[in-house]
Amino acid sequence: MFNSISGILSGKTTDSVYVENSGIEWEIFVSALALDALGTVGKEVKVYTWLYHREDQMRLFGFPNQAERSLFLDLTKVEGVGPRQALKIMSGLNSSSLEKALEEGDLDTLQKAPGVGKKTAQKMILALKGKLTNLNEVSSKGQASVSCEYEDIVTALTEMGFERKSVIVQVEKIAEEMKAAGSDPLKNEEELFRRSIVALS
């Protein structure tokens, strides 16, 4: 129903943001890391959304880019992990660390996320290892889109020892966040490179 909402970031709480668009102020629930990524109050933002609808409530969940939304939706496929729990997990681990832990079956890293014990971590690995939407999409696209625009950065990060598929996913995410904040990634490659290193580390 909603793919994204663009407007002025009019407020923040500990677990949500308010975005004003055409006289309507939307409350959108986000992870702690997304709260920081979306920038400061008063700026124009674009938030990718997912609508949670039950008989007794409707909630909008938001993400700074489409890749994080895909990861969130993957997490909600795990038995016992609902939307609020998925956001908590994404508040404790950045998407790169989370995807890497799921792909490598790293129980210890997954258990660092809020509310994730050994059993939940095992369920997450069983449900999602080798099945993450973002990494599968990178493979199916043949890495073409990133190769065209950001190949120098991808190559540099890969040579530093980071896994290429994870690098591509992160570079795409951060480039999209920069565009949403009004910054051109191609003109600010140093920032894109620096933020990618932080996200991958």
From Swiss-Prot:
<keyword id="KW-0238">DNA-binding</keyword>
<comment type="similarity">
    <text>Belongs to the RuvA family.</text>
</comment>
<dbReference type="GO" id="GO:0009378">
    <property type="term" value="F:four-way junction helicase activity"/>
</dbReference>
<keyword id="KW-0234">DNA repair</keyword>
<dbReference type="GO" id="GO:0000400">
    <property type="term" value="F:four-way junction DNA binding"/>
</dbReference>
<dbReference type="Pfam" id="PF01330">
    <property type="entry name" value="RuvA_N"/>
</dbReference>
<dbReference type="InterPro" id="IPR000085">
    <property type="entry name" value="RuvA"/>
</dbReference>
<dbReference type="InterPro" id="IPR013849">
    <property type="entry name" value="DNA_helicase_Holl-junc_RuvA_I"/>
</dbReference>
<keyword id="KW-0233">DNA recombination</keyword>
<keyword id="KW-0227">DNA damage</keyword>
<comment type="subunit">
    <text>Homotetramer. Forms an RuvA(8)-RuvB(12)-Holliday junction (HJ) complex. HJ DNA is sandwiched between 2 RuvA tetramers; dsDNA enters through RuvA and exits via RuvB. An RuvB hexamer assembles on each DNA strand where it exits the tetramer. Each RuvB hexamer is contacted by two RuvA subunits (via domain III) on 2 adjacent RuvB subunits; this complex drives branch migration. In the full resolvosome a probable DNA-RuvA(4)-RuvB(12)-RuvC(2) complex forms which resolves the HJ.</text>
</comment>
<dbReference type="GO" id="GO:0006310">
    <property type="term" value="P:DNA recombination"/>
</dbReference>
<dbReference type="InterPro" id="IPR012340">
    <property type="entry name" value="NA-bd_OB-fold"/>
</dbReference>
<comment type="function">
    <text>The RuvA-RuvB-RuvC complex processes Holliday junction (HJ) DNA during genetic recombination and DNA repair, while the RuvA-RuvB complex plays an important role in the rescue of blocked DNA replication forks via replication fork reversal (RFR). RuvA specifically binds to HJ cruciform DNA, conferring on it an open structure. The RuvB hexamer acts as an ATP-dependent pump, pulling dsDNA into and through the RuvAB complex. HJ branch migration allows RuvC to scan DNA until it finds its consensus sequence, where it cleaves and resolves the cruciform DNA.</text>
</comment>
<keyword id="KW-0963">Cytoplasm</keyword>
<feature type="region of interest" description="Domain III">
    <location>
        <begin position="145"/>
        <end position="201"/>
    </location>
</feature>
<feature type="region of interest" description="Domain II">
    <location>
        <begin position="65"/>
        <end position="140"/>
    </location>
</feature>
<protein>
    <recommendedName>
        <fullName>Holliday junction branch migration complex subunit RuvA</fullName>
    </recommendedName>
</protein>
<feature type="region of interest" description="Flexible linker">
    <location>
        <begin position="140"/>
        <end position="144"/>
    </location>
</feature>
<dbReference type="GO" id="GO:0005524">
    <property type="term" value="F:ATP binding"/>
</dbReference>
<dbReference type="InterPro" id="IPR010994">
    <property type="entry name" value="RuvA_2-like"/>
</dbReference>
<dbReference type="InterPro" id="IPR003583">
    <property type="entry name" value="Hlx-hairpin-Hlx_DNA-bd_motif"/>
</dbReference>
<feature type="region of interest" description="Domain I">
    <location>
        <begin position="1"/>
        <end position="64"/>
    </location>
</feature>
<dbReference type="Pfam" id="PF14520">
    <property type="entry name" value="HHH_5"/>
</dbReference>
<dbReference type="GO" id="GO:0048476">
    <property type="term" value="C:Holliday junction resolvase complex"/>
</dbReference>
<dbReference type="GO" id="GO:0005737">
    <property type="term" value="C:cytoplasm"/>
</dbReference>
<dbReference type="GO" id="GO:0006281">
    <property type="term" value="P:DNA repair"/>
</dbReference>
